């Protein structure tokens, strides 16, 4: 589960700027 949480954070850093 911890790995999944880190994956979500990693994806958020990528998609965050894209959405902005």
Curated annotation (Swiss-Prot):
Q: What induces it?
A: Expression shows a diurnal pattern of oscillation across the 24-hour light-dark, with increased levels during the light period (at protein level).
A GO cellular component annotated for this chain's UniProt record is:
chloroplast thylakoid membrane
What topology does the record note for this protein and the membrane? Peripheral membrane protein
Q: Which coarse location class applies to the principal site listed for this UniProt protein?
A: plastid
Biased segments, Polar residues type = 1-10
Domain of life (superkingdom): Eukaryota
Where is the protein localized?
Plastid, Chloroplast thylakoid membrane
Q: Does the keyword Electron transport apply?
A: no
Q: What is its EC number?
A: 7.1.2.2
Query: What reaction is this protein's catalytic activity?
Result: ATP + H2O + 4 H(+)(in) = ADP + phosphate + 5 H(+)(out)
Q: Where is this region: Disordered?
A: 1-20
Query: Which GO biological process categories is it annotated with?
Result: ATP biosynthetic process; proton transmembrane transport
Q: Which UniProt keywords apply?
A: ATP synthesis, Chloroplast, Hydrogen ion transport, Ion transport, Membrane, Plastid, Thylakoid, Translocase, Transport
Using the UniProt record, name the top-level EC class of this enzyme in a single word. Answer: translocase
Q: Per the similarity annotation, which family is this?
A: Belongs to the ATPase alpha/beta chains family.
Role this protein plays: Produces ATP from ADP in the presence of a proton gradient across the membrane. The catalytic sites are hosted primarily by the beta subunits.
Per UniProt, subunit arrangement is: F-type ATPases have 2 components, CF(1) - the catalytic core - and CF(0) - the membrane proton channel. CF(1) has five subunits: alpha(3), beta(3), gamma(1), delta(1), epsilon(1). CF(0) has four main subunits: a(1), b(1), b'(1) and c(9-12).
| UniProt name for this protein | ATP synthase subunit beta, chloroplastic
């Amino acid at each position: 589960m911890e790995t999944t949480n880190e994956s979500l954070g990693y994806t958020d850093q990528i998609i965050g700027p894209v959405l902005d």
